UniProtKB/Swiss-Prot annotation:
Pathway: Pyrimidine metabolism; UMP biosynthesis via de novo pathway; (S)-dihydroorotate from bicarbonate: step 2/3
InterPro entries assigned to the protein according to its UniProt record, in alphabetical order: Asp/Orn_carbamoyltranf_P-bd, Asp/Orn_carbamoylTrfase, Asp/Orn_carbamoylTrfase_sf, Asp_carbamoyltransf, Asp_carbamoyltransf_Asp/Orn-bd
Record gene name: pyrB
Quaternary assembly: Heterododecamer (2C3:3R2) of six catalytic PyrB chains organized as two trimers (C3), and six regulatory PyrI chains organized as three dimers (R2).
Protein name listed in UniProt: Aspartate carbamoyltransferase catalytic subunit
Lineage: Bacteria, Thermotogati, Deinococcota, Deinococci, Deinococcales
Cited PANTHER family: ASPARTATE CARBAMOYLTRANSFERASE, ORNITHINE CARBAMOYLTRANSFERASE, MITOCHONDRIAL
Function per UniProt: Catalyzes the condensation of carbamoyl phosphate and aspartate to form carbamoyl aspartate and inorganic phosphate, the committed step in the de novo pyrimidine nucleotide biosynthesis pathway.
The reaction(s) this protein catalyses: carbamoyl phosphate + L-aspartate = N-carbamoyl-L-aspartate + phosphate + H(+)
Family: Belongs to the aspartate/ornithine carbamoyltransferase superfamily. ATCase family.
Residues holding carbamoyl phosphate: 64-65, 114, 142, 145, 271-272
Species annotation: Deinococcus radiodurans (strain ATCC 13939 / DSM 20539 / JCM 16871 / CCUG 27074 / LMG 4051 / NBRC 15346 / NCIMB 9279 / VKM B-1422 / R1)
Enzyme Commission number: 2.1.3.2
GO biological process: 'de novo' pyrimidine nucleobase biosynthetic process; 'de novo' UMP biosynthetic process; amino acid metabolic process
Length: 314
């Protein structure tokens, strides 16, 4: 479990990628290779976090991300405290600050936080004084998803330098799109965000290494990886789309659209999928698909992040 040195101060949290240098990010991805080897063993466990307690504090429902983080912590021998807002004092009106201060009094060593409000993970970092990993805050950021996406692309090509990544779908409401738009250019990739004009947030247009387009063929042309995003209808108030069928007819990631990409281009999706809406079943299950590999890689990447923040000396 090695990591690069001389890469600047080691970040205390993973809230977004603002304080993370490319060298540190590559170190996390390098260490994920080692974690994948652990997951391939008959006994999938190492003592790296033995004696430490990780709290998964999820104020918003999650199955995949929460399970992935809890398994990642346990694979490294950490104790895991699982906090669900619906069964806690939060449902009785307790503030986020009071909840975190109580949990910290229980001697929790690190937090993995998901919250419906943008910036919530920053508040947890402020009030807990412990390392915090943002597992999704509103539509703002989901850094470990972006890291596992980057890792999956790097597995395919060896590097992200000079690669084109097209992300198609509901960009406006997607923390995954925002985190990838922040991360991938740091690692040398070009990012093209594509969707209907109503679902393209203009604030991302001026970001270095990022382009916006409403034309899916333009977005995918020459791409090395194409990511489909689901329509987050639970975050929409209406008026964004004429119809779901019209959206699928234009923006669905399918074999026809993928003909515009590089011949060896891969298909990604952060999940959960709405099959035959934003992605065809053929594309989701076909030879280009790396969707299940993303899930497998997620655990290794999250193990690497936990190691890096809690015990690594990168």
């Amino acid at each position: 479990m090695t990591a690069a040195s001389s890469a600047g101060p080691r970040p205390r949290h993973l809230l977004d990628f603002q304080d993370w240098t490319p060298e540190r990010l590559e170190a996390v991805l390098d260490n994920a290779d080692t974690m994948l080897q652990v997951l391939d063993r008959p006994v999938k466990k190492v003592p790296a976090l033995q004696g430490l307690t990780v709290c998964t504090a999820f104020f918003e429902n999650s199955t995949r991300t929460r399970t992935s983080f809890e398994l990642a912590a346990r694979r490294m021998s950490a104790d895991v405290v699982s906090f669900a807002a619906g069964n806690s004092s939060v449902s009785k009106g307790e503030s986020l600050r009071d909840t975190i201060e109580v949990l910290t009094a229980y001697k929790v060593d690190a937090y993995v936080v998901r919250h419906h409000a943008a910036g919530a993970a920053h508040l947890v970092a402020k009030y807990s004084g412990k390392p915090v990993i943002n597992a999704g805050d509103g539509r703002r950021a989901h850094p470990t998803q972006a890291l596992l996406d980057a890792y999956t692309i790097r597995q395919e090509y060896g590097s992200l330098e000079g690669k084109k990544v097209a992300i198609i779908g509901d960009i406006r409401h997607s923390r995954v799109a925002r985190s990838n738009a922040e991360l991938l250019p740091k690692l040398g990739a070009e990012v093209v965000l594509c969707g209907p004009a109503t679902l393209l947030p203009p604030d991302l247009a001026g970001q270095p290494g990022v382009r916006l387009t409403t034309d899916p063929r333009e977005a995918v042309r020459g791409a090395h990886a194409v990511m489909a995003l689901r329509l987050q209808q639970e975050r929409m108030n209406g008026g964004y789309l004429a119809s779901l069928q019209e959206y699928a007819d234009t923006y669905q990631v399918n074999e026809t659209l993928m003909r515009e990409a590089e011949s060896g281009a891969i298909v990604l999706h952060p999940g959960p999928m709405n099959r035959d809406l934003e992605i065809s079943t053929e594309a989701a299950d076909g030879p280009r698909s790396r969707i299940i590999r993303q899930v497998e890689n997620g655990q290794a990447v999250r193990m690497s992040v936990l190691y890096h923040l809690l015990v690594g000396r990168a």
